[in-house]
Curated annotation (Swiss-Prot):
Top-level taxon of origin: Bacteria
Keyword entries, A-Z: Ribonucleoprotein, Ribosomal protein
HAMAP family documented for this protein: Ribosomal_bL19
Gene encoding the protein: rplS
Pfam family name, one: Ribosomal_L19
Protein family membership: Belongs to the bacterial ribosomal protein bL19 family.
Purpose of the protein: This protein is located at the 30S-50S ribosomal subunit interface and may play a role in the structure and function of the aminoacyl-tRNA binding site.
GO molecular function, one term: structural constituent of ribosome
Protein name, per record: Large ribosomal subunit protein bL19
Length: 115
């Protein structure tokens, strides 16, 4: 990478990000702007993918809401996310868990790692 670009992006990287992987259940506290108000919305689900590197890295979180699958993609280093909590650690053997989209109920469960 160009040293100039690298030096500019190093100052924007966040250091308060916990380590999490696909298969982990996370609780993302995202800032939502509605008109002139700003509030925190919690989105809890399973991380199904992590993509990119450096400042452009992002992750996809999937949850089931009222029987409908909802996925949101968050950049890791965005100021719009106040904090990320890891609720549980999952044991999976894939880096991308897109196959969970086709599974329902107990088949979509992920084995938990005790830490």
């Amino acid at each position: 990478m160009n040293p100039l670009i690298q030096s500019l992006t190093e100052g924007q990287l966040r250091t308060d990000i916990p380590s999490f992987r696909p298969g982990d259940t996370v609780r993302v506290h995202a800032k939502v702007v509605e008109g002139n108000r700003e509030r925190i919305q919690i989105f809890e689900g399973v991380v199904i993918a992590r993509k990119g590197a450096g400042i452009s890295e992002n992750y996809t979180v999937r949850k089931i809401s009222n029987g409908i699958g909802v996925e949101r993609i968050f950049p890791i280093h965005t100021p719009r996310v106040e904090k990320i909590e890891v609720v549980r650690y999952g044991k999976v053997r894939r880096a991308k868990l897109y196959y969970l989209r086709a599974l329902q109920g107990k088949a979509a469960r992920i084995k938990e790692i005790r830490r």
